[in-house]
Amino acid sequence: MSDYLSVSALTKYIKYKFDQDPHLQSVLIKGELSNFKKHSSGHLYFNVKDKESVISAMMFKGSASKLNFEPKEGDEVLLEARVSVFERRGNYQIYVNKMQLDGIGNLYQKLEALKKKLTEEGCFDKANKKSIPKFPKKIAVLTASTGAAIRDIHSTINSRFPLAEQIQISTLVQGEKAKDDIIEKIEYADSLGVDTIIVGRGGGSIEDLWNFNEEAVVRAIYNCKTPIISAVGHETDFTLSDFAADIRAATPTQAAVIATPDQYELLQQIQQYQFTLTRFIKKHLEQQRKHIEHLSSYYKFKQPTLLYDQQIQRRDDLEKRLKQQIQATFEQQRHRLMLLQQRYNLKALLSSVNQEQQNNLQLTNQLVKLLNSKILSYKNDLKNKVENLNNLSPTNTMLRGYAIVNKKDEVITSTKDLTENDQLTLTMKDGLVDAKVTKVRCNND
């Protein structure tokens, strides 16, 4: 029985073999996500399959948090993983460290990330869009030198508005060198002083149109000072260049329509304006003719002197009023001049008063300073005298340990005034002391 292995022992041995194999520690796998689940813990559980096989897989929260897209059922992905055995079930599975979308999916991922970035910078804001001129003199067309796009644009402009000069700028629209060529041609067209630029090409896959999703191309369109019409691909195709351009056309033909007016519509408008103007002129002339006929029947035209008699009288009246007005204006200005002269004299008087006030204020300030100086001197002198008095005060003397000796209300200043058995009163700093003389000693004894 010792030769038989338990299921768990065999599973552990197989897991050991997997974990020790260096070729299984970092494996690159391509496949489709299925049975995708995101656990509440943040771990991802899913299968990776192709047409023939399915592998169980998981991705820990730490690795999943670094993903720059949201995985979902059916995504074609590229994985970097470690192969091991899940002992509980006894089946092998992969532990994914890195995941990215495969092929077109990865392109769409890059497209969305760049679109978000440029949107946040304001490159697609409607407020920055320039209007397309209604009657362009020159139109620059940036597209491939051959193909349906240039033919459609050229024929449409010629049929709609042949007055517009077309400047064809042959441009690479596909391939590795196309990006730099598109940018160079946009900057060149912008320097020509044209009215409108059409940037276009025919339809294709996302890979074919990818140059018009390149950040540098989008920024070149956004920074262009000349209005740009984007006509990249078919109606269902969208590129970031469409969002950066001043207007997006579904097709190259529509771009030519947007860029030009229709000559036949313009001709109809001109004919309509001509008809309206002619009708207006005829009506106005008829009204003026009737007005002249009416005036010619007026009685004053039959007696011409009546036309200017009143005007002569009115002229004389105006002349009189003008003279009166001149005289009144003269008197008004003379009166104003007198007032100004009086005001000037008053101003001079006020100026003199102000000067005296300034002088008085200056003298007052000087007097205040002098008084303050004297007061300060008196204060300092008084302070010194108070200090001297305090020094001579008996109270201050007693504070230093001395006492005042009284005998029958007389102050004793000499031992000669004392005899034995005299009753004395000693005044000290904090009270009185009664004392009796027991012996008298003089300094010369």
Curated annotation (Swiss-Prot):
| Keywords, comma-separated and alphabetical | Cytoplasm, Exonuclease, Hydrolase, Nuclease
- InterPro entries on file: Exonuc_VII_L, Exonuc_VII_lsu_C, OB-fold_nuc-bd_dom
Tell me which Gene Ontology terms the entry assigns under biological process: DNA catabolic process
Q: Which domain of life is it from?
A: Bacteria
The answer to keyword Cell inner membrane applying to this record is no
Q: Which reaction does it catalyse?
A: Exonucleolytic cleavage in either 5'- to 3'- or 3'- to 5'-direction to yield nucleoside 5'-phosphates
**Xref: Pfam families:** Exonuc_VII_L, tRNA_anti_2
User: Keyword RNA-binding: yes or no?
Assistant: no
EC primary class: hydrolase
Q: What is its EC number?
A: 3.1.11.6
- Name the CDD domains on file: ExoVII_LU_OBF (cd04489)
Tell me which family the UniProt entry assigns to this protein: Belongs to the XseA family.
| PANTHER family the record matches | EXODEOXYRIBONUCLEASE 7 LARGE SUBUNIT
What does this protein's UniProt record list under function? Bidirectionally degrades single-stranded DNA into large acid-insoluble oligonucleotides, which are then degraded further into small acid-soluble oligonucleotides.
Q: How does it assemble?
A: Heterooligomer composed of large and small subunits.
Q: What is this protein called?
A: Exodeoxyribonuclease 7 large subunit
The organism named in the record is Staphylococcus aureus (strain bovine RF122 / ET3-1)
Question: Gene name, please?
Answer: xseA
